[in-house]
Swiss-Prot record:
Residues 434-575 form a coiled coil. Belongs to the MAP7 family. It comes from Rattus norvegicus. This is MAP7 domain-containing protein 2. Residues 184-212, 241-251 have a biased composition (Polar residues). The keyword Cytoplasm applies. GO terms for cellular component: axon; centrosome; microtubule; microtubule cytoskeleton; midbody. Microtubule-stabilizing protein involved in the control of cell motility and neurite outgrowth. Acts as a critical cofactor for kinesin transport; in the proximal axon regulates kinesin-1 family members, KIF5A, KIF5B and KIF5C recruitment to microtubules and contributes to kinesin-1-mediated transport in the axons. Its main location: cytoplasm. InterPro entries: MAP7_domain-containing (IPR051483), MAP7_fam (IPR008604).
Amino acid sequence: MERSGGNGAGARAGAPSEGAAKGSSLLSAKSTEGATGRFSQSTPRPTGMDGFLKSDERQRLAKERREEREKCLAAREQQILEKQKRAKLQYEKQIEERWRKLEEQRQREDQKRAAVEEKRKQKLREEEERLEAMMRRSLERTQQLELKKKCSWAGSAASGPGGRDGESENTPPLPLTLAASIPPSDTGTATAAAESTNACDKLSTSTMNLPKQTEPPMSKHLSSSIVAISYSPDRALRSPLKSSYKSSPTRTTEKKKNTLLSGVGDAGKGAMTGGEPSQMEKVKKGRGATSVSSGGLGSPLRRCEPPENISKRSSSPVKSKVTAKTYPQSPKTVKPTYIGSPVKYYFPPTPSEETLKKKAEKEKSNKEKEGATGRQTTVLPREETLEKPMADKDATEKYVADKHATEKHSATGGKAEHSAGKSTAGTTDAGEAAKILAEKRRQARLQKEQEEQERLEKEEQERLEKEELKRKAEEERLRIEKQEEEKKQQEEEEKRKAEEKAKEKAEEELLSKEEQEKEKQEKEKKEKAMIEKQIQAEKEAAEAKAQDAAKQMRLEREQIMLQIEQERLERKKRIDEIMKRTRKSDASLEVKKEDPKVEIQPLPDVENKIKPVVPNKIEINVLNTCQKVNVSERAAPETFPQDIFSNGLKPVGGPVHPDVLDGKSNSLDDSTEEVQSMDVSPVSKEELISIPEFSPVSEMIPGMSLDQNGTGNARALQDILDFTGPPAFPKKSSENLSLDDCNKNLIEGFNSPGQETTLNTFC
């Protein structure tokens, strides 16, 4: 700002060099100074530069705002992604928790089911043990009873031995265990036992290839006993879930019973070495015992079988058929039945003569021995003789018994035979011992195979049970999933139905509201129309009433105006008469001297024209009168009150022809103004008296004289005072009153405001 001219020139000279050096950079400070020095020294920076700087600043700020917005958007997207991730994790966690709960619930149900099953099995085992104990007790009782019966039968059998020869031919041979346990008394019996064992060995190897149709003759005889065994209470109380080949607790008890009974049999056999009954007697007694025992097996706890029969209840082909018919199992619990090794059927050999002779000799020798040793025998030999028929009866049932029970019983029988062989030293030879050993080995091998088969079947059964449990669990899981899906679909369907119902309800409410609004609007329109009609009717009635009232008022006003006009005319007439009377005495002489010629326009047919509208027909030519008559100064006040009075009492417009009245009143006003503006010159009394008497009444009724009124001056003044009220000016004495003063008083009295207001009220 303090630069000199040289400095300014130097600055102006240096500006182009700086601009050339920096390439016309408008954003630098030096170029800005050169540009400003070029134009003016007082402005340091042009407005254009400020605009550029502002635009750069705006761009920078806009860029910063964009960057901040992008950062905010990126942060928001990151938050949204994190939220979605958390929601997904939460959802997965909820799903896992739900699956875990379902799995735990399924496990609990499985455990509960297994516990219930185990409890049921335990209860069944306890029930079986209880029933077995009851059966053992009942067996003991029945054995005691049978022993008593057989004791009585033994005496009768000894008296007639020959009658049973025919029956002995049809009796089957003894089984292997029974034949081995009975020591032969002589070589004949030993050979018979050897033959029977050989036959058993042959049959055991050949029965694998036997057809199913080939049944031994004994099967018919044993059908009744088999049916009775199949309906035994022990079999009826078994669980349907147990298969025929499973090892149940009953089999363990059967083994114990077999060992117990084998010991009893061994004791009996040891005591029988001295002498035993013949084979025919045993078969006969066995048949009798079989019939008795089979007859007592109808009810669950009737005559129970001996322990040998209980141990032989297993799944043979014949019994499986009977039980399948008797106890049909459900498809769920049916399991593959185990078909054991075929039963050894013993075909009875045809009796020959040699065997018959041997039997007869054997009977004789037995009788002799019985007679010798009859005294020495005690209760024990009797029990042995009673148990022999029981053993024979059991032998008949062993033909159709299960292989497993037969093997176990044969093993125990082998042990008993071995002990019996030891007790009866020298009763068996080496061949028979070898056969017995071979039979034992074969039975051990079969037992091992049976155990292996049972183990495999047990494993297979366990595997099947596991698969069944898995399948059930999978079905349960699928069922639960299906139920959940159906429940979810049902909830969605219910929700959708509820939404549809709500929507329909809202639409119905909206429609009802719209209908209500329409009805309301229509009702309001109707009410409004009715109100408008009522208002219109009332308005028309009011207008009619107003018109009637206005008409009535107009008529009344017309009547009043007519009355007022008549009164005014009468007053005017009286005033004129009064004025005439007051002037008459003084101006009678002057009037006689001067006979002024006043042109009075007569109004013909005044009587015809004065009807309801009288004031409109009055014509007062005051102006013409004033122009024609040269009045003096004294005469002007006398005529002025007449004009003022006529002007002040002009009628109100209305139905009484207001145009005519206005015209007349205007003419009167003009005349009044002209009268007031005239230069009144003083006149003499003669001239005043010579002014003709003028009044509207005299114009209307020219033939009427003032004296016809019949009223005096006093009465006229009294009437004026009554009408106009008391004067507003001080009353002057008659002594000091001149003619001029009288006229003045009259003018002031009639022009007072009280009079005009009174007159206006009438109008």
